Amino acid sequence: MRRLTTLAAALLCLSAAAQQQQNSNRNMLLNAASASQPRQISLGLPIAGNAYIFEDGLPVSYYNYQLYPYKSWHSGVSHESTQTMSPQDMVLKYGIISYSVDSRSRLAGDRFEGRINYSFNMYGKQSVDANISTPLGSGWGVSLGSYQNFDPGSNHLDMSYLQERVQFYKGSISKVFAEGRGKAGLIYQYSNYLNHIENFGPFVFVGDGSVRELDGFRLGHDSYRPADRYVDYLDVATGKMARMQIDDANTDKIHNVNFVLDYDLPGGTHLAVHSKYKTGHSFRNNPTISGITQAGPESGFSYADGTVYTGRVQNRRYLHFNAFEESWMSNAALTGQSGDGRHRWRAEADWWRNHAGTETSMWLIAHEVAADPKLLYLNGKPGFSYNSYAEFYNGREDKVFAFASDEWNVSDRLWLYGGARVEYLNVRGKAANDTNPGNARHAGFSLVDPSVQLNDFNDSHFNYSYIGSVRLTLFSGFGLQAEYSSATIHSQLFHYGVYPYPSQKPITANYFRGGIYWRNRWIDMTSQITYIEQKNAQERPSFSHVLTRDAGGMKAGQEENLTMPTYYDLGTLGWLTDAVLTPAEGLSIHVMFTVRNPQYRNFKLTPTFSDGVTEEHDFSGKTITALSKTELEVEPSYSTGPWRFWLSARYFSRQYINKTNSLYFNGRWETFGGIDYKLNDHVSFSANVVNILNQKGASGSITSADLITDPTPYKNYIMAGTFIRPFTVELTTRISF
């Protein structure tokens, strides 16, 4: 499931200074689901895809899809800073309401510096992160770095020695201008990223929101994927069966070249210029879990040697992505302030260009419901329902936009902030998505089918976003504040890969928050009412259905997986309190408490399956899946001498599994903790723990249950889903010189 935009984020304290909008309390790098990706923070709308990441003033990836940002980015010693960019900034910088990671590459300074981090964990993961920089004279300098990661995973897979193998190589040359007027740098990075996505497992859904292990299967420790080391698929481009080695089918290779310029102009104005060229290719074999069915002697399932199989069958959908991106993004920004210091303004202009495409093939497989399962053949074949879903596009996208903002300290009591952004978007290229009936996806679909007709597309739109904030001080350290922002977007290039033609309706998000703030030497708190809505949300969810008769190359009783585009609205009303307490020297406690009611609106769909069965569903008024109505974060930290002790605990209340809200998971905790020790100015050590409570974290929505309305048959029901990272201890040594 992929959403048009990730309109995400909880709330931040309002701040008068732009740099203070980048709040360090969000801990986006502590992710319970993945060790290599930043986490996403929900504002009350569904979260899909991956977190947005900026580096050196521009996005790491043109899209938050295909060549995902985290596949060419790592937060480590090659960055001089990594922080959180708030929705206040993102609504102007990117045109959406979301959090983002914002990072700056480390350039050479006025002396030689070196940094090395070495980490390992209890499951065999090892990583080395190193960077050296040195001046060359006359303001010039160079910096070189590399990040290497070897991760077999906690559930060691037989199909590959490593679940993740990361190779990043980075180098830069920079120039510091005389009299401290600024700095310029040219940065190159090559990324080679191997990643197997496999955090699935079977479990028993008890029926009261709890789960228990199935037949001793250890979530997070046992492998739940066949050991086959090859991917066999029907190539959507050629119409022929193709084979790839499993590691090759899950590797991204990316080149990035960044230029940065920061320069102080006369009169206190600052100029910042950023430009980036990126070219890369992504092979990605993405497996998702579908339902578990029961196979009888006549079901047609067998092992590779022809032995008939009876018993539980795990169905999976595989997507094989063959995608590329070649993009160029540039911007120039001026910042300054008025003579009396009451106004702080910013103006920026951007031009982004992208040439991208994908050939995405799909098929279904089946395997045993067991640890280290064996692949099952259906009617003598290892896969079925080839390309009943498929993507293809090859095109270009241009974005030209500009924005301006101003912070106005009207008086000692009144502060105002406002900004507006206008964007011109043009999308053009080739796809197979017009009204020609032959372009409709079906089992056996490929672009060489005589009935398929590639069509040209060329669409242009204007997108707008704006924000307004106000803060009124009633007395010292206490006052009222409010903010309203809005962002409108349209379909981008990657939405043209499927059938039918993507919607050209604008997708608009509106966000309001308002309440009180209280600040003194021991507390910094905001408590606000929040409301966010999204109109014309676009999604391509997958729905499961047990066939009532033989159809689509499958037999009656087998489960079919149908993917269809849908459009609907969403809305969430909530209340959030966010506070940082400093009751004693060295002690800091961050607490955030959220109560909200996330709901679907105007959400109706009518899927028709291969056996002719049509179902009608109306999810309007239902709670959005995988979002909790109550969230709590508690993050204490205590420093004394060379020691630092910290803890991060997040509670998520009940989350619904399906859009009908008939099934749900009980609340869960995500817990992290650690001890840091600074031996001297050059050496320090850390011991960190993930999932201290060792919760299984069966979470998210389960596709095979999306249309279930009666929960009665699903007590002690065997299903499969995702899990969070198991209890993990990691040790790190940091050396600087």
Where are the predicted features?
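Gram-negative outer-membrane beta-barrel transporters
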Residues: 522-524, 528-542, 550-659, 681-682, ...
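Acidic/polar loop-and-plug regions of large Gram-negative outer-membrane beta-barrel proteins
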Residues: 174, 183-258, 283-319, 373-387, ...
